[in-house]
Regions:
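Single conserved hydrophobic/aromatic residue that forms the stacking wall/gate
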Residues: 172-181
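DUTPase catalytic domain/fold
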Residues: 1-173
Length: 181
């Protein structure tokens, strides 16, 4: 079942999203249509999360290395610099590479709700794929977000601006999970 902005706002007041931006922000100065941003905040049937400026990690290329998901080596990740110009704060995700970031908003998912996080079309048009990420019933924390740059060019990934859509749909569960915290 899709949940609307009223429901999302009520749940945010109960701690589901923090910080919470009521309404979708498209410009930092909406009266003058100045300082456009990648939209974030509450929309009619979802919420656009922002990327935290605290840390962004990219996989470094290590010739001869084969990645093993059963023996993940965090040494293959390296932090990247947060840049700033008139367009805002951003990280650079190199062409054909993969990065990890974290959502600015902390989530506290209700016990009878599961949320799916999807990428924004604004980034998809540039070849940036945001991995579909679930936040299961009763989960609490900052979502780790995975990014793949499938294009042949380096790409900016903006911090403090919309990075993914949450939720496109809520799955209203018939019973709370037995793993409820």
């Amino acid at each position: 079942m899709l949940k609307n902005d009223r429901w999302i706002t009520e749940q945010a007041a109960a701690g589901m999203l923090d910080p919470f931006q009521k309404g979708l922000v498209r410009h930092l100065d909406p009266d003058q249509k100045q300082a456009p941003v990648l939209s974030f905040g509450c929309s009619s049937y979802g919420y656009d999360l922002r990327l935290s400026p605290q840390e962004f990690l990219i996989f470094k290329h290590v010739p001869g290395t084969v990645m093993n998901p059963k023996r993940f080596n965090p040494g293959n990740l390296e932090p990247t610099e947060l840049h700033h110009d008139e367009d805002g704060d951003y990280f650079i995700l190199p062409a054909h590479s993969y990065g990890l970031g974290v959502a600015l908003e902390k989530m506290k998912v209700p016990a009878n709700i599961t949320v799916i996080c999807l990428g924004k079309s604004t980034y998809a048009r540039l070849g940036i794929i945001v991995n579909t990420t679930p936040a299961e019933a009763s989960w609490e924390g900052h979502l780790t977000l995975e990014f793949s740059n499938s294009s042949g060019a380096d790409c900016r990934i903006y911090a403090n601006e919309g990075i993914c859509q949450l939720p496109v749909s809520y799955t209203h569960l018939t019973l709370p999970t037995k793993n409820e915290v």
